[in-house]
Amino acid sequence: MEYQDYYKILGVSRDATADEIKKSYRKLARKYHPDVSSEPNAEEKFKQVKEAYEVLKDVEKRKAYDAIGSGWKQGQGFTPPPGWESRPGGEGVRPEFREGFSDFFESLFGGLGQEARWTRQEFKQRGQDQHSRVTVSLEEAFNGSTRLLTLQEPIVDYQTGQVTSKTRQLRIKIPAGVTEGQQIRLQGQGLPGIGGAPNGDLYLEIHLAPHSLFTVEGKDVYLNLPVTPWEAALGAKVSIPTLGGSVDLTLPPGSQTGQKLRLKGRGLPGGTPGDQYVLIKIYIPEPKNDQQKELYQQMAEQMPFDPRKELLG
């Protein structure tokens, strides 16, 4: 049989109040009533709307329906979960009013007549997982850190249909070496289970904040290094920043813009730590007096060099 998304059919959210559900039902019932509607498949849609309202208007049926979970999609193949059973008593649905209802409805709420009531007794459902995004600095990703998260959990009062939020705080540890998009699983920190079933898990997705000096690819860190023409030509020892502190780097003679130097193990830590790559970019100083212009002129005369030679064949 196919799962019926009653909230989607009525066009309301899962935390809709009883009044919102009733208002939407009345609007859609008028729209699709076969006696007045010119909509295609109006009769079928009217039955779907009627069925959805029959469940969501009733406190116990809605409570039981919600226990199935929100991970299902309209039309998806469905089988009632183990432990789903009926109990006598309470408000049922008279057979004449169930005519045309789906197999999905009948499998969950039909079959016991006017004196039937469906419950969640002995029905267990693992709590839903929650997902959150945490932005950390590159320094935090390198060193590790702790965070105090504030989480909002929806609480539904099935007697009134009102939805409130419960706030809780959770201190978490960000391990050293986390990377962009990595997920941290916190077991049992999701929404509560039903009928004694375990809680869901909380998944934290790591987002690395942009850095003023470094860019990151996986565990590797990249730094653009400005150098002077004479440092590039003659070679030099320069001090550069890394996430673990400053280190000395030797520029080989004849370094070129775009050349990449590797500092092994200076990236983000882990079982196999990343590397830091230094990208050389040569900056040409502008001559500001006649003496400096003369130096450039001497270079042009004493170092004949045509970087466009290959372009001209």
Curated annotation (Swiss-Prot):
Alphabetized SUPFAM superfamilies for the sequence: Chaperone J-domain, HSP40/DnaJ peptide-binding domain
Source organism, top-level taxon: Bacteria
Single GO biological process annotation from the record: chaperone cofactor-dependent protein refolding
Species in which this protein is naturally found: Coxiella burnetii (strain RSA 493 / Nine Mile phase I)
Annotated J domain residues: 5-69
Pfam families reported in the protein's UniProt record: DnaJ (PF00226), DnaJ_C (PF01556)
Entry's localization field: Cytoplasm, Nucleoid
GO cellular component: cytoplasm; nucleoid
Keywords: Chaperone, Cytoplasm, DNA-binding
GO molecular function term, any single one: bent DNA binding
Official protein name in the record: Curved DNA-binding protein
Region of interest (Disordered), residue spans: 71-93
Task performed by this protein: DNA-binding protein that preferentially recognizes a curved DNA sequence. It is probably a functional analog of DnaJ; displays overlapping activities with DnaJ, but functions under different conditions, probably acting as a molecular chaperone in an adaptive response to environmental stresses other than heat shock. Lacks autonomous chaperone activity; binds native substrates and targets them for recognition by DnaK. Its activity is inhibited by the binding of CbpM.
